[in-house]
Amino acid sequence: SSSFGIFAGSDFDIEEAMRVALGEVKSIDFGALKEIAGMNPILAKRFYHETGSMFWLEIDLCPLEKVKEISSSYTSQPGVVGQLLLTIPTNGETEEQNRKLCQEATAASKGFEIITGFAPRSWEIVNLSKEVIALEKIRNENPELAGDPVARKEVQARLAEAHGLLEAEVMRLMDGTIWHRANEAPKRYRQNELNLLASTIADKHFCKTPVVLNELINRVRPSSNANAAQNALLRRMLSHENSERLGIEGFPAEAGLYESVLKLSGLHKKSGKEFVIAKPSKSDPCRFLPLWDAAEELLRSDEKLFSMSDVFKLWQSPPYGVKNGILQLLGTAFVLTMRENLAIYREEVFQTRLTDLEIELLTINPSKIQIRWMNL
């Protein structure tokens, strides 16, 4: 027997909307393209496993015509050891022009490494990007889609497919890219080779990074629980210096920090009949001694007051690269181990000793705590 049914339909002309939207996409926003393509940084994995500190290479896309400008003006962010710049020819440049500009851009980079690259058929990414942008325009700028679930579903499906194709194309380009490094022959890198490259560059720029194998605290932004544990440990460094394990009983959160930083490094150790907080030695497995030496050299360079933020800035810069999360712990240990040669100030007012108030300010605003070297 025959029957009738009701099926959902749509009056929205997606093909016409795509034609109009593509016509309105005149250029590519390369910043947006990086986000659309889901490009993740290249992690320095070996360096991380050896030191506990995470560094990485940024990946960015740029038009070939601007690669020299971008390379020469690049400024690094915390944790970044360099940048991979994948160039896209937007003005019909030849492969030879691409190669020449990439080499010149690499030579023009200053400080941290800029590694430039190009891949055959990289213009395909431009077409896919325009399609993604056009579909997003259709989705966001056509209010009639709100009342048309069939068309809305079709647009969303096409957008998801376009995103997938774009991400796949970026991965294909990365695999086929010829990369240019200063003073080296151009070459292709597989994914694992890029990770090794990131570690090699991290070795070069951060050769004196301390070894802190505690991922809760050795990071740019520790969790609130990690910060609370560190604060508890800092207070115990003041009140229980001469006690074993700083008087910590059991295994609360601060005990893990104590074991992995203070005890392992020898910053807190037994001397005679009691425990003391002592300057790190050359045999310290955490490699803290270069930090102490650098801070002492800074303080000895001038008789003025130096804020703890000056010391922290030094420790964060190459070749040390100390992460924000562990600065307060190391800063407190430095002041305590060098107290016989340091005058301590809070907001430029002399203090006879380090107290909980200075520790709190050291955590909140280290610029308010100052120190001066005294030749006794």
Task: Enumerate the language-model features and the residues they cover.
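Extended alpha-helical scaffold and adjacent linker segments that couple domains
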Residues: 1-376
